[in-house]
């Protein structure tokens, strides 16, 4: 079971991935968590990632791809994963496809969490992260629209659309139904 989770920042991807991971027994691999771990440990990749995150910009593909590849190579991800935050661009999607095809693997689907911009801003301000100022949120939404939205076209029929408004439980139930679980 290998899924990518798409949607704007604040769409609830991380929340849903954590619930799905627990229910389905596959790891939730979040680039945000990978970045925070590397930043917290002061690794060179982490320090580089921090400068971009603090500015509300996407971390460069080579940095992110190396973190993701290392994580996908860990034992708990061999039978599946829920990938949250990568790919964000068509270039990254091609990198992921190659990483998987090198192991004779492919994605089972792409969960696209759809939510209004007003709900995104409200949710992100409420969670109180240091990197979530209103200016940073709006910058990230602009970057998402410009760079990430083309993934929906790229993935085409693999896209599974999820209405990501309502309670956490309602969204989780919709997601499990859409996955056929």
From Swiss-Prot:
Pfam families in the cross-refs: ADK
Any one biological process term the GO annotation gives: AMP salvage
GO cellular component terms given for this protein: cytoplasm
Top-level enzyme category: transferase
Record-linked InterPro entries: Adenylat/UMP-CMP_kin, Adenylat_kinase_CS, P-loop_NTPase
Record field: catalytic activity: AMP + ATP = 2 ADP
UniProt binding sites for ATP: 10-15, 127, 166
Region (LID) residue spans: 126-132
GO terms assigned for molecular function: adenylate kinase activity; ATP binding
Protein keywords: ATP-binding, Cytoplasm, Kinase, Nucleotide biosynthesis, Nucleotide-binding, Transferase
Residues covered by region (NMP): 30-59
Pathway noted in the entry: Purine metabolism; AMP biosynthesis via salvage pathway; AMP from ADP: step 1/1
Subcellular localization: Cytoplasm
Residues the record lists as binding AMP: 31, 36, 57-59, 85-88, 92, 129, 140
EC annotation from Swiss-Prot or TrEMBL: 2.7.4.3
Keyword Protein transport in record: no
Key word Cytoplasm present: yes
Domain commentary: Consists of three domains, a large central CORE domain and two small peripheral domains, NMPbind and LID, which undergo movements during catalysis. The LID domain closes over the site of phosphoryl transfer upon ATP binding. Assembling and dissambling the active center during each catalytic cycle provides an effective means to prevent ATP hydrolysis.
Subunit structure: Monomer.
PANTHER family: NUCLEOTIDE KINASE
Function: Catalyzes the reversible transfer of the terminal phosphate group between ATP and AMP. Plays an important role in cellular energy homeostasis and in adenine nucleotide metabolism.
Recorded family membership: Belongs to the adenylate kinase family.
UniProt protein name: Adenylate kinase
Lineage of the species this protein comes from: Bacteria, Bacillati, Actinomycetota, Actinomycetes, Mycobacteriales
